[in-house]
C-alpha cells in the first residue's frame, strides 16, 4: 500500500503577479523550487490564505533570485497580487517508509525569501 504524503511546502509565499493570458501553471523562482525539491511540471496544490481558494496546477521555473510566484491561466482568477499562498507538493510513499518520511517545508517572508527551513510541520502556528 502507498500513502499520499506531503513532500514539500512553501509556506506564506506572496503572489507577485498573475497572468490570465498564459497557458496555465504557477511560475516559481527556481532557487525556491530547489530548496524544497519541487521540479518543473510537478503537480502542486495552491491554498490562498486571503480568500480560501484551493486548487491544483503544475510548476514552471521562474528566474533564480527573482522571488516570483506568478499564477497563470485560469488560476489567475483565484488570486490577486499580494495574496498569501501555500504551495504543497505530495508524493506516494510506501507504507514501510511512511514513519521515516520527512517533508521539506520552507517559510517565506514578505519578499519571498526563505527565512526558515523546517523538517516537519511544527506543532504550533507559523506566521
From Swiss-Prot:
Cofactor binding summary note: Binds 1 pyruvoyl group covalently per subunit.
Pathway per the UniProt entry: Cofactor biosynthesis; (R)-pantothenate biosynthesis; beta-alanine from L-aspartate: step 1/1
Superkingdom assignment: Bacteria
Matching CDD domains: Asp_decarbox (cd06919)
GO CC annotation: cytosol
Annotated GO biological process: alanine biosynthetic process; pantothenate biosynthetic process
A GO molecular function held by the record: aspartate 1-decarboxylase activity
Enzyme category, top tier: lyase
Active-site residues annotated for this sequence: 25, 58
SUPFAM superfamilies on file: ADC-like (SSF50692)
Record EC number: 4.1.1.11
PTM characteristics: Is synthesized initially as an inactive proenzyme, which is activated by self-cleavage at a specific serine bond to produce a beta-subunit with a hydroxyl group at its C-terminus and an alpha-subunit with a pyruvoyl group at its N-terminus.
Compartments (UniProt record): Cytoplasm
InterPro entries attached to this UniProt entry: Asp_de-COase-like_dom_sf, Asp_decarbox
Reactions it catalyzes: L-aspartate + H(+) = beta-alanine + CO2
Protein residues bound to substrate: 57, 73-75
Modified residues (Pyruvic acid (Ser)): 25
Classification via Pfam families: Asp_decarbox
Subunit structure: Heterooctamer of four alpha and four beta subunits.
Entry's family note: Belongs to the PanD family.
Known function: Catalyzes the pyruvoyl-dependent decarboxylation of aspartate to produce beta-alanine.
The protein's name: Aspartate 1-decarboxylase
Organism: Halalkalibacterium halodurans (strain ATCC BAA-125 / DSM 18197 / FERM 7344 / JCM 9153 / C-125) (Bacillus halodurans)
Amino acid at each position: 500500500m502507498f500513502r499520499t504524503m506531503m513532500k514539500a511546502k512553501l509556506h506564506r509565499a506572496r503572489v507577485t503577479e498573475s497572468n490570465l493570458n498564459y497557458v496555465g501553471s504557477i511560475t516559481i523562482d527556481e532557487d525556491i523550487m530547489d530548496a524544497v525539491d519541487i521540479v518543473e511540471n510537478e503537480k502542486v496544490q495552491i491554498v490562498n490564505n486571503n480568500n480560501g481558494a484551493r486548487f491544483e496546477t503544475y510548476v514552471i521555473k521562474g528566474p533564480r533570485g527573482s522571488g516570483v510566484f506568478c499564477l497563470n491561466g485560469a488560476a489567475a482568477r483565484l488570486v490577486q497580487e499580494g495574496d498569501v499562498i501555500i504551495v504543497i507538493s505530495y508524493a506516494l510513499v510506501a507504507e514501510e517508509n511512511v514513519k521515516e518520511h520527512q517533508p521539506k517545508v520552507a517559510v517565506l517572508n514578505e519578499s519571498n525569501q526563505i527565512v526558515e527551513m523546517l523538517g516537519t510541520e511544527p506543532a504550533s502556528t507559523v506566521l
